[in-house]
Curated annotation (Swiss-Prot):
Lineage: Bacteria, Pseudomonadati, Pseudomonadota, Gammaproteobacteria, Enterobacterales
Family in the record: Belongs to the RutC family.
Organism expressing this protein natively: Enterobacter cloacae subsp. cloacae (strain ATCC 13047 / DSM 30054 / NBRC 13535 / NCTC 10005 / WDCM 00083 / NCDC 279-56)
Catalysed reactions listed for this entry: (Z)-3-aminoacrylate + H2O + H(+) = 3-oxopropanoate + NH4(+)
GO BP of this protein: nitrogen utilization; uracil catabolic process
Sample GO molecular function, one term: deaminase activity
Pfam families for this protein: Ribonuc_L-PSP
Domain of life: Bacteria
Keywords: Hydrolase
Key word Cell inner membrane present: no
Gene3D superfamilies (alphabetical): RutC-like
EC number: 3.5.-.-
Presence of keyword Transport: no
Name this polypeptide is given: 3-aminoacrylate deaminase RutC
A single Gene Ontology CC term: cytosol
Length: 128
């Protein structure tokens, strides 16, 4: 199955051997996305809402670069560092998925950079 690598202009260069997204058989797989600027610095330190918005905007850019929209998202894997941020993260998350919600899970864990509060990996079916 052929795949296309998705690297939107202006996104950070991954700090490990992966790309922001891949497209195969009409499915976009978005790698775990952290609240990084283009130089891999954590943005909006101690602000779970702003970090979540930044992460979801980055995911949106990857999906749109592949030819899809956020309405095409079918699954999200959410990783958070502290349950106290759960409500704030969900508030912003709901803004990006106002209609039919995708399936998802959410777990608390440590992330690759201590100031990052949220990481999201996404699957979207764009039908191409």
């Amino acid at each position: 199955m052929p795949k296309s690598v998705i690297i939107p202009p202006g996104t950070s260069t991954p700090i490990a051997p992966f790309v922001p997204g891949t497209l195969a058989d009409g499915v976009v797989y978005v790698s775990g996305t952290l609240p990084f600027d283009k130089d891999n610095n954590v943005v909006f330190i101690n602000d779970p809402k702003a970090q979540t918005r930044h992460v979801l905007e980055t995911i949106k850019t990857v999906i749109e670069t592949a030819g899809g929209t956020m309405e095409d998202v079918t699954f999200n894997s959410i990783f958070i560092t502290d349950w106290k941020n759960y409500a704030a993260i969900n508030e912003i998350y709901a803004e990006f998925f106002p209609g039919d919600k995708p399936a998802r899970f959410c777990i608390q864990c440590g992330l690759v950079k201590p100031d990052a509060l949220v990481e999201i990996a996404t699957v979207a079916h764009i039908g191409k």
